[in-house]
Amino acid sequence: MSQRTLEAHYLPNWRLTQAHGLSGYNCGYAVQRGGASFHEHQQALVWRLIGEMAIGPKSTVVDVGCGIGGPAGWITERYQPRRLIGVEYLWSSVAAAHARAAAEADRDRPASRPIFVQGDAHRLPLADGSVDVIFNLESALHYPDKRTFISECRRILAPGGALCLGDITTSHRWLFTPAQLLNRLPSQYNSNVWLWSPKDYRRAFDAEGLELIRHEEASRPVADSLADGIAEIRHRGPASMKGFRGRFFYLAFLEKLLRARLLRYDLFCLRRSR
């Protein structure tokens, strides 16, 4: 992965969050279309992925590909784990996550604040068997070597630990081969994705001895969430799209691809055997 191309890809996302008061980059999950704000949909996707996973005051949680830190903050606030570490490849996002955490910190409980470090998902900067829950949402699509990433997750998970992974996938990879030619371009229009199918993920999980405990194909509620988010932006008028107009149309196209099932959105929960 290239810092330069990923920075270019995510700059419009950063502008969108700043213009519309959002805390994260994920697509969201709409239980009912029009039933909540896009910000609430984004939080709903986090809770949907975690599901019934046990996170408590003795847990160490790692958010790999934490972006600007919104979900890490939400998880910390709801579950109060002993430690939450956000690992992010882009230095600019690490800085933004630090700033957000400092602004939202509970002064009476300074230890509850998540910490953020720069790191590569292919070489996670954590000790073997040191993590209880790994959270990875809408980030693995950017990893050129997902097998190494999943192997790294297996390495750092404690026995009985869990991996919660949500990603955009496809069973029609050949359709997106031309888009991958843009991966090297330092432009907001680069795709910067290496898509897997759900079967690819299942094979990799099996190879690492990770037991699948829950799998949801969430394309429809994710597409509904995007539709609500797009409607919110439209409602504020063209001026509110300044600096990310291209990303607005990208998200609208993504919604259509999810509805047509040319792309999918899959949520996986797995456990490392004891």
Residue locations for each model-derived region?
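N-terminal, positively charged/glycine-rich alpha-helical extensions of SAM-dependent methyltransferases
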Residues: M1-A30
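A short glycine-rich, Lys/Arg-flanked "PGG" loop and its adjoining helix->strand segment in the class I
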Residues: R147-A162
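Conserved alpha-helix/loop element of class I SAM-dependent methyltransferases that forms part
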Residues: E40-P57
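Class I SAM-dependent methyltransferase SAM/SAH-binding core
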Residues: V62-V64, I68-R123
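Conserved Class I S-adenosyl-L-methionine
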Residues: E216-R274
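Acceptor-substrate binding/catalytic loop of class I
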Residues: R184-D200
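Conserved class I S-adenosyl-L-methionine
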Residues: C164-P186
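A short acidic, Gly/Pro-enriched loop at the edge of an enzyme's catalytic core
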Residues: H122-V133
